[in-house]
């Protein structure tokens, strides 16, 4: 679990700048997202994230996909760590200023 986690089960953390670890998680679920959206993303850079402790960890990520376009992803990182990742949901047509919320 990342050091920025609040540690409060069920509580969603404040938004934090993306870290290399969070970018790595996003990169691992990028293909799942591309299959669901039928798009290929040349740029895929997480700019901020929030986390929620559950049976594992839910990560909410704001991703810059280029050309002024952003999307939000909801990813479950299971108890076994970074090899146990599942894209739970996503929202497209977001802007840089859209707040990252639980969805």
UniProtKB/Swiss-Prot annotation:
Question: Which positions bear N-acetylmethionine?
Answer: 1
Note the site residues: Reactive site. 10
Q: PROSITE patterns recorded for this chain?
A: CYSTATIN
Enumerate the CDD domains for this protein.
CY
Q: Name one Pfam family in it.
A: Cystatin
Biological processes annotated in GO: cell-cell adhesion; keratinocyte differentiation; negative regulation of proteolysis
Give the matching InterPro entries: Cystatin_dom (IPR000010), Cystatin_sf (IPR046350), Prot_inh_cystat_CS (IPR018073), Prot_inh_stefin (IPR001713)
GO cellular component terms listed in the entry, alphabetical order: cornified envelope; cytoplasm; cytosol; extracellular space; peptidase inhibitor complex
**Residues spanned by motif Secondary area of contact:** 52-56
Enumerate the UniProt keywords alphabetically. Answer: Acetylation, Cytoplasm, Protease inhibitor, Thiol protease inhibitor
Q: Where in the cell is it found?
A: Cytoplasm
Task of the protein = This is an intracellular thiol proteinase inhibitor.
Q: Which family does it belong to?
A: Belongs to the cystatin family.
**PANTHER family assigned:** CYSTATIN FAMILY MEMBER (PTHR11414), STEFIN-3 (PTHR11414:SF26)
Q: What is this protein called?
A: Cystatin-A
The record lists the organism as: Rattus norvegicus (Rat)
Point out the gene that encodes the protein. Answer: Csta
